[in-house]
């Protein structure tokens, strides 16, 4: 009798699994200031860790279909952008049905959908190349998109700052220029994977004009987030005793402000995806 052959999954299945894994890894990462993690719900009374897991898992079909769409079109083009937009809206409906209407991963659908698609087009590309190509794809119009007066749009008008859309269109600078390099530096310095990922999150928080923070607590809250994240990194990161003290202080400040760096969390998931997908 021949030994059973291992089942070979498709590239689209693999990329969807990597993206969902990145979302779950981001949710599980602890202690994250102001965010849902294994300790608490952070500044989110309407969310929990099991809800974040369920939301991430609900996006697997949508992300797989995005990868398949990219393979079908075979290139970065406007029809692919339109297809991703439609699939993303369908994924958002599935997410909201799973969470009872709670917006857990809307920004992550956008970021990871783009990255899954460009990785499906060229799975051997490195992280920098994938981010640049995702930016090109994000710049294309989605003719079926209905303008929505979202929190992010209101923040953009009020404070003149870009959100998730602009980060993607620029090629994810907070991830490529800050999150991924910090992840690699912390690993090289001997930090555990958890601490390296926390440091990557902090590096993103330190530079991102996070619309989630601006919506909840305005520019002063954003300054608290950015300065607090820099303070942790200045003490050697989350792996050091001094860094952990700064991290606890930052968490308390954010809970007091009811501020949550949700945009940075979405970009950390993108960072973790690129960290793995960029080495396929």
From Swiss-Prot:
Entry keywords, A to Z: ATP-binding, Nucleotide-binding, Transferase
GO MF, any single term: triphosphoribosyl-dephospho-CoA synthase activity
Pfam families, per database record: CitG
Catalytic activity of the protein: 3'-dephospho-CoA + ATP = 2'-(5''-triphospho-alpha-D-ribosyl)-3'-dephospho-CoA + adenine
BP-aspect Gene Ontology terms: prosthetic group biosynthetic process
Transmembrane segments: none
Gene3D superfamilies: Triphosphoribosyl-dephospho-CoA protein
The EC number(s) this enzyme carries: 2.4.2.52
InterPro entries to which the protein is assigned, alphabetical: CitG (IPR002736), TriPribosyl-deP-CoA_syn (IPR017555)
Lineage: superkingdom: Bacteria
Family listed: Belongs to the CitG/MdcB family.
General function of this protein: Involved in the formation of 2-(5''-phosphoribosyl)-3'-dephosphocoenzyme-A, the prosthetic group of the acyl-carrier protein of the malonate decarboxylase.
This protein's name: Probable 2-(5''-triphosphoribosyl)-3'-dephosphocoenzyme-A synthase
Species of provenance: Pseudomonas putida
